[in-house]
């Protein structure tokens, strides 16, 4: 049986990613790790991470967009930022692949709205479909997982349910 741990669960105050990997290696039954991109990779050499992992394998990477994407990740009205979000997905796929993983999880945390008519729903939904298709075409060997949270970070997520996720 495989047992994976998310990196955030083991990074305590004053610790770093390498400390968390060590803690996971010492956890009986742990077989796989799940990283957030870019936060768990930034500032580290991949060879350093591979060495720290030892026998542990990578299940996948979850892409996490942060503060400068507050107006949208894959739906950002600033096309440069939107393209940066898509590029981050591709980078996560490359690193996941290099570390032996096979799943990219996308939480569209900022793709949604806080009040009615804040966005052009049809246009933004089309943007999400096109962006995910671009990532899927780029990483054909990867599984793409959509993590939806109906009311996070926005009051209303654009992709807010299993049904909407399947509709993509």
Describe the role of every protein-language-model region.
Residues 74-168:
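Active-site acidic/histidine proton-transfer and metal-coordination neighborhood
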Residues 1-91, 97:
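N-terminal pre-domain/capping segments
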């Amino acid at each position: 049986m495989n047992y994976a741990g998310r990196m955030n669960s083991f990074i305590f105050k004053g610790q770093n990613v390498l400390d968390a990997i060590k803690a996971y290696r010492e956890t009986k039954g742990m077989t796989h790790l799940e990283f957030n991109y870019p936060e768990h990779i930034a500032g580290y050499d991949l060879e350093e991470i591979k060495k720290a992992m030892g026998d542990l394998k990578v299940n996948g990477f979850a892409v996490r967009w942060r503060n400068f994407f507050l107006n949208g990740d894959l739906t950002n009205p600033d096309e440069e930022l939107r393209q940066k979000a898509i590029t981050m997905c591709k980078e996560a796929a490359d690193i996941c692949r290099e570390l032996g993983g096979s799943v990219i999880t996308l939480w569209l945390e900022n793709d949604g709205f806080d009040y009615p008519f804040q966005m052009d729903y049809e246009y933004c939904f089309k943007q999400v479909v096109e962006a995910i298709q671009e990532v899927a075409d780029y990483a054909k060997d990867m599984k793409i997982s959509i993590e939806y949270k109906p009311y996070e970070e926005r009051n209303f997520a654009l992709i807010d349910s299993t049904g909407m996720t399947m509709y993509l």
